[in-house]
Amino acid sequence: YARYQEALHTNNAVDFDDLLMHAVLLLRNNVELRAKYQQKWQYLLVDEFQDTNAAQYELMQLLANAPLNNRNLFVVGDEDQSIYRFRGADYRNVQLFRRDFPDAVVVLLEQNYRSTQTILDVANSLIANNRNRTPKRLRTDNGQGIPVHVYEAYNEVEEAAFVADEIQKL
């Protein structure tokens, strides 16, 4: 890691995390610059909000908390779909958003257009075990569908062989 940081410095380069931190520090410490960008964008949209990290959350706050833009902020996210914890994402930003923006209207998207109800019932039973989540019940008009079969592989090689065999059966 030290060599990586040294290579960045030597090449006068930054990585994605550095870009975020530099932007946050600039906007946090420079009121005029912050006001410029708050005025530049009347609306802010953040998609996949459950996969934002602390720096991205603060960047959003710095840009949205402007008297002139009336906090015109639209975020889309679902704590149950967070998959980037290993990259610093924190699904709890969804709860922080509700705390920091108490006037925000929350719309639950529970209607599913892709899956059958059998699949959604399995998903509902799994996500019900997630902690610190917004309660919701996924549903569809696509019908019940066929039963879900579960296969537990011993390792990734066994899993790959199983998937290949299932594909061959198609």
Walk through the language-model features, giving the residues of each.
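Helicase P-loop NTPase motor core
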Residues: 102-105, 110-170
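ASCE P-loop NTPase helicase motor core
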Residues: 98-100
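Conserved helicase NTPase motor core
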Residues: 1-96, 108-115
